[in-house]
Amino acid sequence: MREIELASWKDVSRRVSSIAKSLEIIYETKLTVNFCEIPLERVFPTEDFLENDKLALVFRKIVEENYDVPITVVKSGGDYFVLDGHHRAFIRKKLMYETIKANVLEFPEGKTYRAIPRRRLEDLRMKDVSPIDDLILKAWQRILFVVEHYEAIHDVPFYLSREKIQLKDLVPTQPHVGKAQIDAIKKVLVPIACVRSGRKCYILDGHARSLRAKELGLDFVEAMVLLSTARIDFGIVKTAEAMGLRKLEDIKII
């Protein structure tokens, strides 16, 4: 697995200055830089994809550590185009944050940034640029894969709600889980992924983690619940019912 160096508060000033200087040379004008919080609904990407390993790491750090290093954007009218921080902006949007800290570069009156089409952050897709060896980070990546998978199936964006779900409200969607897989989990460190139907949450990723939480005597497990603005009937619900799966105890450990 390659080494990933994420942006930090310590090097933000240097990164912003470097980007601003490059644009000033290209456009032959002086830019102003303002630090503020901007609405994510007005933030648009300038890149075509997200790196799989970096995205998983950013996802983990935002959830676990409230990683909030400002992104760098250029303002064009009422829109903001990301120059540095696509992964941070994408994850915050998926987690349903409304704003993000940003260093905003602005052109003087009479000068504008190049014309660029507006694309939704949600439309960015992961590109497999490097394998992930770390098992914990790989589990975070699987949650993102689940989101992409369901977006491809239903052709709508999905978002993630971080919640604590009671184990009694979980419904498995696979009949078997290997005992070795459960035993390998010493502590439940990664949220499960699930969808809600009625009062129940159907597990999409994290069966072994859920069973381990039960073995540890926990009543709740942290979960990322997939949400969409569209009304969706999840086929996985009917599949679970057809297999006779209604509670964690219905899983056969092999």
Regions from the PLM with identified roles:
Residues 1-83, 87-204, 208-227, 233-236:
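Short, charged/polar connector segments at secondary-structure boundaries
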Residues 136-140, 249-254:
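Extended, charge-rich low-complexity interaction segments
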Residues 240-245:
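Long, compositionally biased intrinsically disordered regions enriched in Pro/Ser/Gly
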